[in-house]
């Protein structure tokens, strides 16, 4: 390769695969300019089509797709500016070659071969412009149609979620109302039991008085009294057993109400997140309020900033089973436990726990 070829290759270097001029002539220069402009337009058209394809692959994330499209268009605009600057530089060199050739030819008008080449170049340029404009209009129409379909699908999904949340809330209200009725019946039974115990105590007092009289009687009366006392002790044992069972029932009912409080708070948070509102504090599985020393959780970023120790304390408090060897799921499990299940929360990417914690 000659030194002149190396100089031309270095001067007209490009990343579009367009072959530099073979010689310093107006014909070769115009051939290179025509090929370079066509390749640049194809490159820009390919970038816009890629942006539309990225938009179609992310139908469920409208905001992210629009951001991707905006970035792609910005890159296309930057590339367009770069290619325009390069094209201006190349055109200046080719025009200089043309002025040199016109000076050498010293003719009043361009030669026939030049007019013929210019006519073919203008015709090809107009065809490329029309084709590029048509493809761009088609891409715009297709992108607009896809965006309308995304909006309709997102609106439909949101209505379905609202209906489902409303149904779950009504079911929880009905279950809570039923539990309150059961608690009311249990309290009534406890009142009756207390009344019976008061009557039993009165009878016991009367029985003790009679026992004092019976002690003054014969040994036979003592034996009969011992038998009666044994029977009474059996009755007391049975009453204590019943009382223990009632305490167990009360404990089970308390745990059930605590679980319902946690579920109601979590469902309320799910509804609040659907309207992009911060959540409220969810009581623990046993009904206790989270430790005031623990960081408050009102949004998905609060969970991401938790330390490993605080995250495990929250998971244990809500009764969530977790794998100690797989810490990547801890924050996602905690987000579901407190009701952070909106589309933004589900798409949020958690950072790993810091090794210094």
Swiss-Prot record:
Membrane-spanning parts: none
Cell location: Nucleus
UniProt keywords, alphabetically: Meiosis, Nucleus
GO CC terms, sorted: nucleoplasm
Domain of life of the source: Eukaryota
Main location: nucleus
Gene Ontology annotations of biological process type: meiotic cell cycle; meiotic drive
Function: Has a role in meiosis.
Assigned protein family: Belongs to the UPF0612 family.
Protein's name in the database: Meiotically up-regulated gene 135 protein
Native source organism of the sequence: Schizosaccharomyces pombe (strain 972 / ATCC 24843)
Originating gene: mug135
């Amino acid at each position: 390769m000659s030194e002149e070829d190396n100089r031309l290759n270095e001067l007209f270097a490009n990343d579009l695969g367009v072959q530099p001029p073979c010689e310093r002539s107006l014909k070769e220069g115009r051939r290179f300019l025509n090929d370079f402009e066509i390749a640049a337009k194809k490159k820009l058209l390919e970038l816009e089509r890629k942006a539309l394809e990225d938009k179609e692959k992310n139908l469920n994330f409208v905001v992210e797709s629009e951001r991707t499209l905006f970035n792609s268009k910005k890159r296309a605009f930057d590339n367009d500016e770069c290619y325009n600057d390069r094209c201006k530089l190349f055109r200046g060199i080719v025009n200089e070659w043309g002025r040199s050739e016109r000076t050498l030819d010293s003719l009043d008008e361009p030669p026939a071969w030049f007019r013929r080449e210019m006519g073919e170049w203008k015709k090809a340029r107009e065809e490329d412009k029309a084709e590029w404009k048509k493809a761009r209009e088609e891409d715009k129409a297709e992108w607009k149609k896809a965006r309308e379909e995304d909006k309709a699908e997102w609106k439909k999904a949101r209505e379905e979620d609202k209906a489902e949340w409303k149904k779950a809330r009504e079911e929880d209200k009905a279950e809570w109302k039923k539990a309150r009725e059961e608690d009311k019946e249990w309290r009534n039974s406890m009142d009756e039991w207390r009344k019976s115990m008061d009557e039993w105590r009165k009878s016991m007092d009367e029985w003790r008085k009679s026992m004092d009289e019976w002690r003054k009687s014969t040994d036979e009366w003592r034996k009969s009294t011992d038998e009666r006392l044994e029977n009474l002790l059996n009755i007391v044992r049975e009453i204590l057993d019943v009382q223990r069972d009632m305490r167990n029932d009360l404990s089970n009912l308390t745990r059930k109400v605590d679980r319902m409080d946690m579920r109601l708070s979590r469902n309320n948070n799910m509804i609040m997140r659907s309207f992009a509102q911060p959540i409220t504090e969810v009581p623990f599985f046993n009904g206790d309020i989270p430790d005031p020393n623990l960081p408050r959780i009102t949004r998905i970023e609060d969970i991401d900033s938790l330390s490993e120790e605080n995250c495990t304390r929250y998971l244990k408090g809500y009764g969530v089973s977790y794998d100690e060897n797989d810490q990547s799921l801890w924050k996602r499990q905690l987000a579901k436990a407190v009701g952070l299940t909106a589309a933004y929360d589900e798409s949020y990417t958690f950072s790993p726990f810091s090794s210094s914690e």
